[in-house]
Amino acid sequence: QPSISDQQVSALPYSDQIQQPLTNQVMPDIVMLQRRWMDRYEIDSLIGKVEQEWVAIKAFLNQAQIEVRHDTEMKYYIVHLKIVDFGSSCQLGQRIVEVLGIPPAHILDQAPKFFEKLPDGTWSLKKLHNILGVETGGPGGRFKDLILRMLDYDPKIQPYYALQHSFFKQETGIAGHPTYQFSANTGPAHYMTEGHLAMR
């Protein structure tokens, strides 16, 4: 059987599904991982899935415009490849103005989502709450409302209800899914859902 280096072994996933006491018996279909056992073919079957999830993670990072410069070692991922460390991440191009100066007007003119031209001819960067949410049906109110609810100390919005907020929904009124209505008040203590009152 081909030998496996210590470095390769340390990078392999762990499994609690197959555990056997340590013996001197040769077991060609079993790989020892720090007193734990995993079937060799189970490891082989994970290779394609791991690569697929790794590509999906990279695609997500690119879409989110987050550049990960370090801390992408396998020890920062747990099967099924959940990212557990963003310690060295930074926003893409966060120092572009300091390094290259203000972009030329013809470039700013092509990014109306992020910049607006003032009457005096200068450019201004839009507020974050006016930028986020554009793709989901309208910026501004929904994002600002959600943030204010999260910052409201008592009563603070619970994670379950935060996920139901319209900011996270691309479509509303889908059959089979509850429709949550949020009042214009930034600090309400109640939510209306499916015609009944739910306390936070």
Curated annotation (Swiss-Prot):
Catalytic reaction(s) noted: L-tyrosyl-[protein] + ATP = O-phospho-L-tyrosyl-[protein] + ADP + H(+); L-seryl-[protein] + ATP = O-phospho-L-seryl-[protein] + ADP + H(+); L-threonyl-[protein] + ATP = O-phospho-L-threonyl-[protein] + ADP + H(+); [DNA-directed RNA polymerase] + ATP = phospho-[DNA-directed RNA polymerase] + ADP + H(+)
GO biological process, one term: protein autophosphorylation
Enzyme class: transferase
Family, similarity comment: Belongs to the protein kinase superfamily. CMGC Ser/Thr protein kinase family. MNB/DYRK subfamily.
GO cellular component: cytoplasm; nuclear speck; nucleus
Gene3D superfamilies: Transferase(Phosphotransferase) domain 1 (1.10.510.10)
Name of the gene encoding the protein in the UniProt record: DYRK1A
Protein name stated in the entry: Dual specificity tyrosine-phosphorylation-regulated kinase 1A
